[in-house]
């Protein structure tokens, strides 16, 4: 009889935990849904409050979402903290790092922005966003021979992308490769006809 009581007690505890888990999951889903609704209305403080009701510091998804909402609310320091927590929870997360660079850029933490893009490339060497911006960083300090490798990779993956072709054109000009610059500037103008910067670049191709 004593064994039966213990067995029934264990079943009761299990059923209670399952029920609690179901209620918790429902509450979390509702909080996310409500936060999306408020975000759509540009009520970012409301969206943050919705998620705060169920927030757990060890939840990757909640930290990622809070990072985005705080960024939308222009609370850049808080956004940075939440994205960092998400990165700490999922060390190979590219999406959290791409989120992180947004508030870091607004706070003018350019060293962190650059390092984060480099970290992304260690995880995902073909990430187009990271390759583009690392290439731009090298272009800005006139290291065209390094910058070209990053932008050529992006253009090879996205041949009709305006930004990549446009940037690669200026890098080619920096390297004295006018014929190559002409090709990609022309491609950029197919994507964005009449663009002033691409037109200017094309005019410099001898």
Where are these regions (language model features)?
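Bacterial Sec-dependent N-terminal signal peptides
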Residues: 1-28
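Terminal, low-structured helical/coil segments at or just beyond the last alpha-helical repeat
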Residues: 25, 174-206
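Alpha-helical segment of the N-proximal tetratricopeptide repeat
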Residues: 26-56, 61, 65-72, 102
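Helix-start (N-cap) detector for alpha-helical repeat units in TPR-like alpha-solenoids
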Residues: 28, 60-62, 94-95, 128-129, ...
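Structural signature of tandem alpha-helical TPR/SEL1-like repeats
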Residues: 40-49, 72-85, 95, 104-119, ...
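Structural marker of alpha-solenoid helical repeat scaffolds
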Residues: 55-57, 89, 123, 157-158, ...
């Amino acid at each position: 009889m004593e064994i039966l009581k213990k067995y029934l007690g264990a079943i009761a505890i299990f059923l209670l935990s399952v029920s609690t888990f179901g209620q918790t999951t429902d509450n979390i889903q509702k909080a996310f849904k409500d936060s999306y609704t408020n975000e759509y209305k540009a009520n970012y403080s409301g969206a943050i409050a919705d998620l705060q009701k169920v927030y757990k510091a060890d939840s990757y998804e909640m930290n990622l979402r809070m990072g985005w909402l705080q960024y939308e609310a222009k609370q850049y320091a808080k956004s940075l903290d939440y994205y960092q927590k998400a990165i700490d929870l999922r060390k190979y997360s590219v999406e959290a790092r791409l989120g992180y660079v947004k508030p870091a850029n607004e706070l003018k933490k350019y060293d962190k922005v650059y390092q984060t893009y480099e970290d992304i490339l260690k995880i995902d060497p073909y990430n187009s966003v990271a390759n583009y911006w690392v290439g731009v960083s090298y272009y800005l300090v006139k290291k065209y021979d390094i910058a070209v490798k990053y932008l050529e990779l992006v253009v090879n993956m996205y041949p009709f992308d305006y930004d990549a072709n446009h940037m690669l054109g200026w890098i080619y000009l920096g390297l004295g490769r006018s014929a190559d610059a002409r090709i990609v500037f022309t491609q950029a103008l197919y994507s964005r006809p009449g663009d002033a910067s691409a037109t200017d670049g094309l005019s410099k191709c001898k």
